[in-house]
Amino acid sequence: MVKIGVLGLQGAVREHVKSVEASGAEAVVVKRIEQLEEIDGLILPGGESTTMRRLIDKYAFMEPLRTFAKSGKPMFGTCAGMILLAKTLIGYDEAHIGAMDITVERNAFGRQKDSFEAALSIKGVGEDFVGVFIRAPYVVNVADNVEVLSTHGDRMVAVRQGPFLAASFHPELTDDHRVTAYFVEMVKEAKMKKVV
């Protein structure tokens, strides 16, 4: 069984844990840097990205997270987690973890009152996934090596680049665990490759 960490500094941590467990993997709430060595994949939950960055800096997680990404272990960022994974952020000089060749705009779908749900077709997941968008970012631009898994209107809302997965929406806030199960499969595949 693969062990998937959920960064436990802020956001919908409990909901991600429940979704990971429902997808047949072991979930670990990561609150200490040394826990990164014990896991096969990591979820960066949604929340408020500037608050998340402050907490990451306060607890000295940034370099260990970048090292985790460089090791090739899978990472899945939802909402604010997508912002953390992006190499380029509109209106900001520097990236956070910067593992994905994507350009992201924060709060691109509007403020809290503009939050909404939408039926999404997600490549490798299904045609009828309900995406929950809360002050959601979206992907403005991708490099050629990034696969677009889903769009809402003309906006890219789910992308994959090798071991990295990012979504504008909150899959953990529904009872549909297919997106988390997709990530669990990514983690299993990556772990199998390491063993071979």
UniProtKB/Swiss-Prot annotation:
The UniProt keyword set, sorted, is: Glutamine amidotransferase, Hydrolase, Lyase, Pyridoxal phosphate
Q: Which residues form the active site?
A: C79 (nucleophile), H170 (charge relay system), E172 (charge relay system)
Q: Which GO terms describe its biological process?
A: glutamine catabolic process; pyridoxal phosphate biosynthetic process; pyridoxine metabolic process
The pathway where this protein functions is: Cofactor biosynthesis; pyridoxal 5'-phosphate biosynthesis
Record InterPro entries: Class_I_gatase-like (IPR029062), PdxT/SNO (IPR002161), PdxT/SNO_CS (IPR021196)
The molecular function GO annotations come to: glutaminase activity; pyridoxal 5'-phosphate synthase (glutamine hydrolysing) activity
Xref: Gene3D superfamilies = 3.40.50.880
Q: Name one Pfam family in it.
A: SNO
Catalysed reactions listed for this entry? aldehydo-D-ribose 5-phosphate + D-glyceraldehyde 3-phosphate + L-glutamine = pyridoxal 5'-phosphate + L-glutamate + phosphate + 3 H2O + H(+); L-glutamine + H2O = L-glutamate + NH4(+)
**GO CC: one term?**
glutaminase complex
> What Enzyme Commission number(s) appear in the record?
4.3.3.6, 3.5.1.2
Instruction: Tell me the residue numbers annotated for binding L-glutamine.
Output: G47, E48, S49, R106, I134, R135
For the keyword Lyase, the answer is: yes
Matching NCBIfam families: PLP_synth_Pdx2
State the family named in the UniProt similarity comment for this chain: Belongs to the glutaminase PdxT/SNO family.
Q: How does it assemble?
A: In the presence of PdxS, forms a dodecamer of heterodimers. Only shows activity in the heterodimer.
Function comment:
Catalyzes the hydrolysis of glutamine to glutamate and ammonia as part of the biosynthesis of pyridoxal 5'-phosphate. The resulting ammonia molecule is channeled to the active site of PdxS.
Q: Sorted alphabetically, which PANTHER family does this protein's record hold?
A: PYRIDOXAL 5'-PHOSPHATE SYNTHASE SUBUNIT SNO (PTHR31559), PYRIDOXAL 5'-PHOSPHATE SYNTHASE SUBUNIT SNO1-RELATED (PTHR31559:SF0)
Protein name in UniProt: Pyridoxal 5'-phosphate synthase subunit PdxT
UniProt source species: Bacillus cereus (strain AH187)
List the gene name: pdxT
